[in-house]
C-alpha cells in the first residue's frame, strides 16, 4: 500500500488538539486496512519525523433506522494516535 493511501487526513477536534498540546501525539484518520507498522513508516516518510509509537482505534459501522422504515448504517473509520519521539513536532497549520 502506498504511503499516500495510508494517511487519509489529520483529525482536528477538541480532544485531538488537547492530546497534541499535552503530549507529543498527533491523530490521523487512516486506511482501515493499514496496520501499525505501515502507519509508522508512512508518518516518518511523509513528515520526516521519528515515531515512538502508534495506537489504533477502530470504529465499526453501526446500523441506523429512520422513521421505522429506512435502514442504513453509519460510516466506520480507523484513527491512529501517533506518538512522536522527544523533540519532534508536526505543525499542520504553519502560517495560517
From Swiss-Prot:
Gene3D superfamilies, sorted: 3.30.70.330
Function recorded in the entry: One of the early assembly proteins it binds 23S rRNA. One of the proteins that surrounds the polypeptide exit tunnel on the outside of the ribosome. Forms the main docking site for trigger factor binding to the ribosome.
Any one GO molecular-function label of the UniProt entry: rRNA binding
rRNA-binding is among the record's keywords: yes
Keywords, ordered alphabetically: Ribonucleoprotein, Ribosomal protein, RNA-binding, rRNA-binding
Gene Ontology BP annotations: translation
Signal peptide range in chain numbering: none
Family note: Belongs to the universal ribosomal protein uL23 family.
Name under which the protein is recorded: Large ribosomal subunit protein uL23
Oligomer status and interactors: Part of the 50S ribosomal subunit. Contacts protein L29, and trigger factor when it is bound to the ribosome.
Alphabetical list of HAMAP family matching this protein: Ribosomal_uL23_B
Any Pfam family: Ribosomal_L23
Cellular component, GO annotation: ribonucleoprotein complex; ribosome
Coiled coil segments of this chain: none
